Amino acid sequence: MKKFIALFLLSGLFLQVHGQKPEETEDWSRRPEVVTPGKGTLPPSDAIVLYGGAGDLDKWESDRDGPARWDAGEELTVVAGTGGIKTKESFGDMQLHIEWRSPSEVKGDGQGRGNSGVFLMGKYEVQVLDSYQNETYYNGQAGSIYKQSIPLVNACLPPGEWQTYDIIFKAPVFNEDGSLESSAYVTVIHNGVLIQNHVEILGTTEYIGPPRNDPHPAKLPLQLQDHGNPVSFRNIWVRPL
């Protein structure tokens, strides 16, 4: 009897599926936009280029006041003591590509060696650090979500070599009363290696104390940190999502 019922149900399922058409599960609601991928390290056709070399700082300003004061040529280099820089344009959800390198001459150790940071929305730091044969606390090494999430692996290249971060960021959402509706999430690929896999960001990345979730606008500038080390950047572009 049980075998008969099973066969009956199976035959019914077959007839149900057999009577359907493949077109019923085809989705024609949104045609994907055609985008031309960049060749090599060039940005894709729909990217906003934030720094492409040739001393172009038009899209940046100081995070203190006035114009950005970093050295700008084919690459963009931190000038210690001048403060960080931030984009004039604001971003929320985004795909970010950025290349960086620590100085080839090794000075210092731990957090004092090739230190900078990529601050998403100016609040959530993906750590930049020379972590090649350089021990420090693990949630503060290169590719960490600073003081929150240890990278899956250490994919750092030797000092002086160009490195890449490809970052997918989903901004947090706040309710009208200022409470957090949904956290920020981030995925980070370092030199082609996945090191943060859709990680929840618990709030602002603080040097001292726990993360905070103070409400803020849906879009804010991207910021690069002056931590006193001459770290260089190039080929910075973003795709708002």
Where are these regions (language model features)?
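Positively charged n-region of N-terminal signal peptides that target proteins for export
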Residues: 1-4
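Carbohydrate-interacting regions of secretory-pathway proteins
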Residues: 19-241
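Hydrophobic h-region of N-terminal signal peptides that target proteins for export
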Residues: 8-18
